[in-house]
């Protein structure tokens, strides 16, 4: 979104983009997705090329719309499971989007639209915190979207 060039991209700003999301408006979904990715990658030089690669995949907008609808209606873990099932069946879903960055989008959506069951980000920073402070909880997710039940333990 063009306005990302004018304001610091804080969690509150990205949550504001997510708050505008509906299950129908793909342009707003795309803006919220981009905001979450820019927030996640920060100032690293390879962020834009990775996001462009994801968004250039055939079916990206339809897949993002499905994930968005499921997140809004059923929550982050259901969307996580949907991505896993689509990939496992060979259909594919948001190719090149890993769980660490995909859960950023899910997290902002649930934070903006749900009063409880906020889906957290599932990245190395969060996993390290759990490893240090909640040693009895197994939050390892393997190489991607492979353990939706473990993601549910976060929620």
Task: Describe the function of each predicted region.
Residues 1-92, 114-155:
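An N-terminal alpha-helical hairpin/helix-loop-helix interaction module that forms a charged
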Residues 101-104, 125:
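Non-catalytic alpha-helical scaffold/packing segments enriched in small hydrophobic residues
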């Amino acid at each position: 979104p063009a306005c990302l060039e004018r304001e610091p991209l804080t969690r509150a700003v990205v949550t504001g983009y997510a708050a505008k999301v509906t299950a129908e408006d793909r342009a707003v979904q795309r803006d919220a997705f981009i905001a979450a990715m820019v927030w996640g990658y920060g100032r690293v030089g390879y962020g834009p090329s990775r996001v462009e690669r994801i968004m250039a995949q055939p079916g990206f907008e339809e897949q993002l719309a499905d994930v968005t609808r499921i997140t809004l209606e059923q929550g982050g873990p259901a969307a996580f499971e949907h991505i896993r099932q689509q990939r496992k069946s060979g259909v594919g879903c948001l190719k090149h989007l890993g769980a660490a960055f995909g859960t950023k989008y899910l997290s902002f959506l649930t934070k903006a639209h749900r009063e409880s069951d906020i889906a957290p980000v599932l990245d190395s920073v969060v996993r390290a915190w759990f490893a240090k402070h909640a040693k009895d909880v197994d939050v390892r997710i393997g190489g991607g979207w492979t353990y939706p039940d473990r993601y549910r333990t976060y929620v």
